[in-house]
Amino acid sequence: MEINVDEEAGIIKEETVPLLDDQNRNRDLPDIERNTMMQKAIGKTFQTTANLANLLPTGTVLAFQILSPICTNVGRCDLTSRFMTALLVSICGFSCFILSFTDSYKDLNGSVCYGFATIHGFWIIDGSATLPQELSKSYKLRFIDFVHAIMSFLVFGAVVLFDQNVVNCFYPEPSAEVVELLTTLPVAVGVFCSMVFAKFPTTRHGIGFPLSAK
């Protein structure tokens, strides 16, 4: 701020001087906007990948998150820990795949029955109920169920790659190429799977998923 004194009128005038000149502000603004847009894009991508975890069986993801630090010894693996971690990932991955073929049925009394979709209809696990043939056929196995099962398996793989304990267990000293792959691959899988699930949403409400209103 500059203060000018008008000697003839005896009036003190204040003139405001901008802290940054227009030239510097116009030169810096595009970089700021560009960085902000990039940060938003990256944040949205990671948020999309995180939201995909909601498409996985809740119990499977919870079990993996609880057992991962134990099996990996918080990322400091020996041969036994590495074997246990591989076994944990395999079991949870298979669980995500196979549970994609489960569905639920709520009867008039409000009781929920879980079962597997088959090529003939719906097989209730505990045999507590028997659905009419026409209703059972509406639950039968379809090709899209296999697509959803594969996508669930891939999404779980992305969740595993975001787990630093597992990554440190199998890659304690990763090369630059491996670090780049471990960073970009889960994001790519998340974007691809989100597009598939958005285009072909699942209608199943199986074990570990929200209940069906049917």
From Swiss-Prot:
Keywords: Membrane, Transmembrane, Transmembrane helix, Vacuole. It is found in: Vacuole membrane. The keyword Lyase does not apply. Pfam families: DUF679. It is a multi-pass membrane protein. GO terms for cellular component: plant-type vacuole membrane. InterPro entries: DMP. Expressed constitutively in leaves, stems, flowers, siliques and roots (e.g. root hairs). Its main location: membrane. One of its GO terms (biological process) is endomembrane system organization. The chain crosses the membrane at residues 52-72, 83-103, 143-163, 178-198. Belongs to the plant DMP1 protein family. Involved in membrane remodeling. This is Protein DMP6. It comes from Arabidopsis thaliana.
